[in-house]
Amino acid sequence: MPAEEVFAPQVEKIGKRTVLLRAFALPRGDEAMAAVRAIESAAPFRHMITPGGFTMSVAITNCGAFGWTTDRRGYRYTSADPATGKPWPAMPALFTRLASAAAGAAGFPGFAPNACLVNRYAPGARLTLHQDRNERDFSQPIVSVSFGMTATFLFGGRERRLPTAKIALHHGDVVVWGGEDRLRFHGVLPLKGDEHPLLGRERVNLTFRKAD
């Protein structure tokens, strides 16, 4: 993504190898949401089942060569949407550029994601503390992009029992973590608060990873 196309973000270091880029994706909000709607038309959002039999409150879809899925058999990446048997929608070029640029700004040059998990939160939806461990190469960072309602991001340590920081993520904010922070626990508190002018009472999160 050319430098002149990127809004100059406020950079906050929230870990040794974790950076919060305030408003980094703000100029691309409308375009990104149009891309999400196109992805949804090919691979609709759904509430997946965890291996423990619980229904996730967050609605999920994917784009890219691989999509993250969960059911009673476990967490994993698949090249096809289990609901249709068809490949996941291709990752929009905008998404690839945005994720690569954010990773570069956070000190992880050359990031080339091949999986984008799209999470949609309604009020009350949450994401419990977890680690991203289904990828083969932990040397690659995680890039998380927020749109819509403000959410409270929980960022902990490498063990679940360790304290968590609570960080407000607003429309257009991007969090990037990797290196020694790559396996830190993280989550999202139940969504609440004021509606957003663009998305209403909804939050959409794009999580970019290198799955293989």
Predicted regions and their residues:
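Non-heme Fe(II) oxygenase metal-center motifs and adjacent flexible, charged/small-residue loops
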Residues: M1-D212
